[in-house]
């Protein structure tokens, strides 16, 4: 009977000893909850991207600005998954909404005959970009923000726009813009 009990307990003891000898466990997070810190980092990344496009234009002209803008768009927006709900500040008529990567690129750097009114918002001589959030909503792997973005140019002039973004967190942790609405504040 004692021998039988020992045989029942021995595998449990061996299992316990085996677990103690293992390295740290592999952890898999099964939710994609986006955090406020990730959203703010994505907004700061967007501002940094805009300033990089502006600096690229100043130092290397249109070709360098376009290549930089392509990288910024590919990193920050979710066009690779389908249409993005993008309404730029200075767009109107049939070209108000930019569901495609090409439409976003034209807005940021201009130079696309399919978008003749675009002069390149991001190639202006921007020196700073700052986000002020009024609302941040976090919902699983998505987040919405609403507030203002202020841009300062080389002459020190500040332009402030009303900005609404929606962000998506991919399974690998990458945060991408799926909605971007920008407009000038009402003056009345």
PLM regions and their residue ranges:
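Bacterial N-terminal signal peptides
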Residues: 9-18
């Amino acid at each position: 009977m004692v021998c039988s009990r020992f045989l029942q307990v021995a595998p449990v003891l061996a299992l316990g000893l085996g677990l103690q000898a293992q390295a740290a466990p592999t952890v898999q997070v099964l939710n994609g909850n986006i955090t406020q810190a990730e959203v703010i980092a994505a907004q700061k990344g967007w501002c940094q991207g805009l300033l990089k496009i502006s600096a690229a234009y100043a130092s290397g002209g249109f070709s360098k600005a376009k290549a930089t803008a392509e990288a910024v768009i590919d990193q920050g927006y979710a066009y690779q998954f389908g249409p993005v709900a993008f309404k730029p500040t200075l767009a109107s008529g049939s070209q108000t909404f930019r569901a495609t990567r090409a439409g976003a690129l034209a807005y940021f750097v201009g130079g696309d005959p399919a978008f003749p009114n675009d002069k390149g918002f991001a190639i202006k001589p921007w020196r700073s970009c700052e986000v002020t959030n009024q609302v941040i909503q976090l919902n699983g792997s998505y987040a919405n923000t609403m507030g203002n973005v202020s841009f300062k140019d080389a002459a020190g002039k500040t332009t402030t726009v009303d900005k609404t973004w929606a962000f998506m967190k991919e399974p690998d942790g990458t945060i991408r813009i799926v909605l971007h609405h920008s407009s000038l504040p009402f003056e009345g």
